[in-house]
Amino acid sequence: RFRLPFRRPPIRIHPPPFYPPFRRFL
């Protein structure tokens, strides 16, 4: 009986709001 969050993806996996602008810097 494993309770893995497969149906609901962890919000942590999503990039933060400051992630998109950071890419521009790269």
Swiss-Prot record:
Principal location: secreted
Domain of life: Eukaryota
Leucine amide found at: L26
Transmembrane spans: none
Tissues where this protein is expressed: Leukocytes.
Cell location: Secreted
Biological process according to GO: defense response to bacterium; killing of cells of another organism
GO cellular component: extracellular region
Keyword line: Amidation, Antibiotic, Antimicrobial, Cytolysis, Hemolysis, Secreted
Disulfide links within the chain: none
Keyword Lipoprotein in record: no
Family from the record: Belongs to the cathelicidin family.
Function: Has potent antibacterial activity against the Gram-negative bacteria E.coli and P.aeruginosa. Less active against the Gram-positive bacteria S.aureus and L.monocytogenes. Has low hemolytic activity towards human red blood cells.
Protein name: Cathelicidin-3.4
